[in-house]
Amino acid sequence: MLLPDWKIRKEILIKPFSEESLQPAGYDLRVGKEAYIQGKFIDVEKEGKVIIPPKEYALILTLERIKLPDDIMGDMKIRSSLAREGVLGSFAWVDPGWDGNLTLMLYNASEKEVILRYKERFVQIAFLRLEAPAKNPYRGNYQGSRRIVLSKRS
């Protein structure tokens, strides 16, 4: 079952929380302080924006730290305004027990560069309640992330 706005506010730890980002059945995550494009880390907070060149991908850190209880998971989708500009997103589930900022991958499939501003809303996360708490909630490689984390695949 999807959590409505009032349950998101009550049951999910989101820091920093923005009333503007709270939606009827989700929360709009914002562009955080760091990005990774073409092999380089970018200080988005200092630059004020991140530019994704045409036909390139970017890793974007969320401004928000999300902490999920053991019976709630997250599902993310790119905001439709960005999709209409040719931006695609590939996101994994946010597992029950997750705690940290999220590193999200965007791909600019368009012929024009895409500019994302620091603290701009770019991805919506919806929260789903499991029928019971997970027996083995997430405690993996990326738990506790506060910065962009590159793949830990060996």
From Swiss-Prot:
Q: Which organism is it from?
A: Pyrococcus abyssi (strain GE5 / Orsay)
UniProt family annotation:
Belongs to the dCTP deaminase family.
Q: In which pathway does it act?
A: Pyrimidine metabolism; dUMP biosynthesis; dUMP from dCTP (dUTP route): step 1/2
Q: Which NCBIfam families match?
A: dCTP_deam
Task: Please state the Enzyme Commission number of this protein.
Answer: 3.5.4.13
Any idea what job this protein has? Catalyzes the deamination of dCTP to dUTP.
Q: Which reaction does it catalyse?
A: dCTP + H2O + H(+) = dUTP + NH4(+)
Task: From the Swiss-Prot or TrEMBL record, give the protein name.
Answer: dCTP deaminase
Keyword Hydrolase: yes or no? Answer: yes
Organism superkingdom: Archaea
Q: Keyword Nucleotide-binding on this protein?
A: yes
Q: Name one Pfam family in it.
A: DCD
GO annotation terms (biological process): dUMP biosynthetic process; dUTP biosynthetic process
Enzyme class comes to hydrolase
Residues binding dCTP are 79-84, 95, 124, 138
Which keywords are on file for this protein?
Hydrolase, Nucleotide metabolism, Nucleotide-binding
Q: Which residues form the signal peptide?
A: none
